[in-house]
Amino acid sequence: MAQHGPVLGIDFGTSNSAAGYLRDGKPHLIQMAPGQMTLPTTFFFDFETRQTLIGEPANQALLDGTEGRFMRALKRVLGTSLMHEKRQILNERVTFVDIIARFLREIKIRAEAETGLTFDRALSGRPVVFHGTGDRREAQAEADLRACYIAAGFKEVDFLFEPEAAAIASGTLDQSGEIGLIVDIGGGTSDFSLFRSGNDGVSILANHGVRIGGTDFDRSINIDRVMPLLGKGSTLRKAIGPGTTPAPNAIFNDLATWEKIPFLYTAQTRRMVEEMAQLSETPEKMNRLVTVLQDELGHDLAFAVERGKIAANNGANCPHIALDQIERTLTVVLPAEELAPILAVHAQALAGGATETLQLAGVTAKQVDRVIYVGGASPMVLLPHPMETLVPQSPPSFPQVFNPLNGGLALPPHPALRRTETPPPHLP
């Protein structure tokens, strides 16, 4: 990136976003709303006013039952064919590039209004992997994100791996030469950076990532606890002849997936579910699914699951998932001790990601001096943190989950950041 004009560091997240810039040599976070340094990465297209709402107003419109279309977790669509498909929303046909660009433009506008500066240059965080190591969609995902920034009004955009930004912001460890492992568990991906601190900055030894985040935790809880109440796992009578067949899992899996929910609200899907309800051996359950699609309650359910997850994680008394949007007294009890088995598969994947990071650097677990957790999903104490087993000797650190990442994006990456292609032969 050419060195001219101020740079706006942007953490465009799956669930929440933030921005910052360098002021008087120190990172300064932009206030997205009074007292709020983050902006929910959500959209609501109001059918009555024909307006597009972003952030908390979008969330509130959904909670208020305003007629419209809600969207969240669009970062997970980057790199897929859906990004460039035009669809009718309000009075125009738009792509997801257009929609994400509007969100980034709003961040740009708020930053310029607060600072009085013009930001033509952006340094954007990006996950180490969008979809998976070696996935053919990786290059396209970054190209899509770049296109969104350009469409938002930025003239130049560079990218920095999100865990590297957190490593920069974390600065040096207790002693020069110590090794730290950044574990960035975000809404849609989890990234790992192994770095070594020194008097002259931070050296990145290895980066790795897996496509697992907080929205996947929500999805697993939703599928395990909520979808059975809507007919998942039930049987349908065959339309012709005797016998039964299982209800198809695909619709329940999509309904539990944040970024796929809007695509279920079609006449074809509604007709299919109505036919399933007529053939169901448990029609009271399948009729709930009919209601969810007719009244477009998919995101309401997803938020209810998220609230229940947070309550269980925070040690609330009798945590539960309230489903009164469907039926007034419908509730799912969510005991904290039952979350670990539901999330076990994700814990295993995180352990694999951390192990692979160490192997890429040629570093053993015993050489790691500290594990630093960042990212919005990192405070999930009920998720069995595999690093506690992998590196039990390393004290964990939980700085504010967003500030380290965006602070690193606001700081200049050179000369503090260096990537070490081949680890030195004698690591401390």
Residue ranges and their predicted role:
Residues 83-84, 116-117, 231, 235, ...:
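Intrinsically disordered or highly flexible coil/loop and linker segments, enriched in small
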Residues 176-185, 232, 414-428:
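A polyampholytic, Gly/Pro-enriched intrinsically disordered region
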Residues 1-39, 58-182, 198-214, 330-364, ...:
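N-terminal phosphate-binding loop and flanking beta/alpha elements of the actin-like ATPase fold
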Residues 187-190, 265-275, 374-379:
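Core structural elements
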Residues 75-81, 116-119, 274-281, 313-334:
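Flexible hinge/switch segments at interdomain interfaces of large molecular machines
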Residues 38, 197-323:
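Phosphate-binding glycine-rich/basic clefts of nucleotide- and phosphate-handling proteins
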Residues 223, 227-232, 389, 393, ...:
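Short, well-ordered loop/turn and helix-capping segments at boundaries between secondary-structure elements
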Residues 190-197:
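Amphipathic beta-strand/beta-sheet edge segments enriched in Tyr/Trp
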